[in-house]
């Protein structure tokens, strides 16, 4: 039986937060990835490329995302974990999905297809896996995770903002990840969507950047409607069971706490 633990993506935003609070025998990033080859691990945390480096960053450089994803897929067989926490995105799931929803079989969007490919191969090759499907990650310090947050924190000097006023966002704070995952592991469940209450672009703008409300564009039917995913396991966090891990009121307060503390 293996005893060592490994964290793949330790130098990233989520990785640094996680590994400062929990010990891992191997802290792995792209420079020392080969240290995992031929080794067995009792537990391994594995970050998808979009979670590690930012969903918007990966969308802007699909070629780099595809190269990195294919490299990870090609070396899955070189690592032998007994239990894996695979942290990926919700992009492979329908916009109204829960944990009973099957991931998309394929996508014309190469960014989404990369998420599908790694998810499919990792779950095929590894035995015990907890799949953590993060919604839109919100970071107050790192750009490239959420287009909405990036736009509100660093808006262009003038003109209407390139965001949809009624699009729904389920912003997930990186500081939650450790507690949410550790709550899931004893449950023995195969997947979790740590679903936050959906808020519109307008509501989020009003909460953290009210000075930009008059720069929101008018609504049009062609604009995206956003994410309304829920979790069948939400009752482990919150009662009553409504599909979300926190209340709408708490989500708004947390947004202000992390992104606009002067408005509290």
Regions found by a protein language model. Give the residues of each.
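NAD(P)H-binding glycine-rich loop region in Rossmannoid oxidoreductase-like domains
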Residues: 32-99
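Short, solvent-exposed loop/turn segments at secondary-structure junctions
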Residues: 11-13, 48-53, 90-93, 136-139, ...
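Catalytic helix-loop patch of NAD(P)-dependent Rossmann-fold dehydrogenases
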Residues: 60-71, 92-139
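N-terminal Rossmann NAD(P)H-binding glycine-rich loop of SDR-like oxidoreductase domains
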Residues: 2-24
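Structural signature of the Rossmann-like NAD(P)-dependent dehydrogenase/reductase core
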Residues: 46, 83-86, 130-136, 193
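NAD(P)-dependent short-chain dehydrogenase/reductase
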Residues: 116, 120-182
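Mid/C-terminal beta-alpha module of Rossmann-like enzyme folds, strongest
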Residues: 178-239, 243-264
């Amino acid at each position: 039986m293996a005893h060592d633990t490994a964290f793949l993506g330790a130098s990233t935003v989520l990785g640094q937060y996680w590994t400062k609070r929990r010990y891992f025998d191997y802290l792995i990033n792209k420079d020392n990835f080969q240290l995992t080859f031929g080794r067995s691990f009792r537990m391994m945390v594995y970050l998808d490329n979009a979670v590690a480096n930012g969903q918007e960053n990966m969308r802007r450089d699909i070629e780099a995302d595809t190269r990195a994803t294919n490299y990870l897929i090609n070396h899955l067989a070189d690592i032998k974990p007994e239990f894996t926490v695979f942290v990926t995105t919700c992009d492979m799931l329908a916009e109204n999905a829960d944990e009973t929803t099957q991931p998309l079989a394929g996508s014309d969007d190469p960014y989404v297809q990369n998420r599908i490919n790694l998810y499919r191969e990792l779950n095929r090759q590894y035995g015990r896996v907890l799949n953590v499907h993060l919604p839109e990650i919100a970071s107050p310090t790192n750009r490239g995770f959420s287009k909405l947050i990036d736009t509100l924190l660093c808006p262009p000097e003038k003109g209407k903002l390139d965001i949809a006023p009624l699009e729904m966002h389920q912003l997930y704070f990186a500081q939650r990840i450790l507690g949410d995952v550790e709550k899931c592991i004893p449950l023995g469940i195969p997947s979790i969507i740590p679903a936050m209450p959906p808020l519109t672009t307008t509501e989020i703008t009003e909460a953290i950047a009210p000075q930009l409300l008059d720069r929101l564009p008018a609504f049009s039917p062609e604009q995206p409607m956003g994410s309304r995913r829920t979790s069948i396991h939400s009752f482990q966090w919150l009662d009553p069971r409504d599909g979300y891990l926190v209340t709408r009121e708490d989500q708004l307060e947390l947004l202000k706490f992390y992104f606009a503390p002067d408005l509290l």
